């Protein structure tokens, strides 16, 4: 009797700790419901995370981020807040030069247009749940924050590069460095150009980091572009990367460099996490 009970216990523990396959992705579970996620081979199809949806603390981070973005959006709608919002929730080269480094993060929660907010939060909800269920809520939060900061810095860095390219540092007045007037004039012109550089706001860069992570985890999952066109997720990701690359240097009002910076953050996060798990 005791031997039979011991065998049943061993069989139960073996089943609880062996990997459970969904498509060709592997999710390891244990008695504490902690899990690790990584891909082996090429995953296929749609993934069923329903067994983990009772872990509300993970997916609740998605709602926390949506709520924070909504609160900042509402703050933008009050006219008396306009000066404060422009100072503390827009990131630009001028803002960073004046010591407002926190704007690299706060801009990732900032939307003054409902359509902009809705588009980013709609995307965050669907892709953010994937990452939260696979990697945990804390991981999703960190990825959003880091992706947002990197996206802001990518925007500022690219705008600075474009400004310097249009007006090289070595110019007519630089040949007269001995003349204080020309040096002063160059400094003033540089400051004016810095102030005129476009500021950035929005969660797009942070959301792109999450999209990149999700796409790389599940590259063959079906995604319906605009709810109509079925695409494998890697094709979906490639289309948007190409769109942002082509859009660099255009004046279409879209922060393409920020999008690419966010996507690069998500790709690096995937490589670091996947490499650690495969060891």
Positions of predicted regions on the chain:
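A detector for small-residue-rich transmembrane helices and their helix-helix packing motifs
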Residues: 5-279
